[in-house]
Amino acid sequence: MIDIFIKTYPGDFIWLEYCIKSIEKFVTGYRDIVIVTDSGTELVLNSELSIKIFYEDLPNETHPCPVGIGYAWAQSVKLNWTKYTDADYILQIDSDTMFTNNIDMSYYKTGDKLKWFYREWSESGEGIIHRVPTDFFIKRESTRDHMPSPTWFFSRKTTELFQNWVNENWGGIWNYLNVHARQLWTMDLNFESAHMSTHKGWGSCEYHMYGNFIEFFHPEEYELVHISQYAVPIRQSWSWGGLKEDEIKFREELLSK
């Protein structure tokens, strides 16, 4: 069973409406849409789809991330998705993305394997800033950028293995993101890396964490696929810039076809 999983927050609700409408129009092969958002603001969606909404309180702590503790908390929620659904698999997407054509969840399977997309670090451009945080988390030199696409397909089995590994090595996902990874943000680093010149004060990213875990420790369920073969019809935007009129026009026209 496959669910679609979205971690959002009130500032992204306007984007989420379009994301949900695009799923309704274009996506098949899943059971439920599972949404986790911050407590305090009710999320109301006008949709006939099967949607389950969970509310979580933000931790009452400060964090060195420039946008506050919500960024790290969202990563923790995404990597602990098994708390919110009993699905065997989930597709994670961000609320500011939007499908633009038909796709079935079977796309993410190839034979008896699941697809996880990557690119070489040499191909990552500005994404190279994630190399040192990835090396720090995985406790070895990473070889690939595992976050080049805007959709990510998780399995319960491998996620639970990942969670166990993080518990054993870092004391849990939230403990890693909120305690150990703080040094990545503050640049007060207590470890060595051959790529330290690429580090610009960015913390670990959840999909680099999971993708490198797959590559180094438990690749059994997955086939690593180069991003050049990525064919998901999706539009990725950046909600921090706000939803501009031209973007609204594009989305409305697409959904009306």
Region locations from a protein language model:
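Active-site-proximal specificity loops/subdomain of glycosyltransferases
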Residues: 44-84
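Conserved catalytic core of nucleotide-sugar-dependent glycosyltransferases
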Residues: 103-197
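Conserved glycosyltransferase catalytic-site signature
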Residues: 68-76, 96-97, 203-208
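Short, solvent-exposed loop/turn segments at secondary-structure junctions
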Residues: 9-12, 39-42, 58-61, 95-100, ...
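A glycosyltransferase accessory/donor-loop signature
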Residues: 175-257
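Nucleotide-sugar donor-binding/catalytic module of glycosyltransferases
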Residues: 4, 16, 74, 97-107, ...
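GT-A fold catalytic core of metal-dependent nucleotide-sugar glycosyltransferases
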Residues: 77-121
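N-terminal anchoring/stem segment of glycosyltransferases
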Residues: 1-61, 238-242
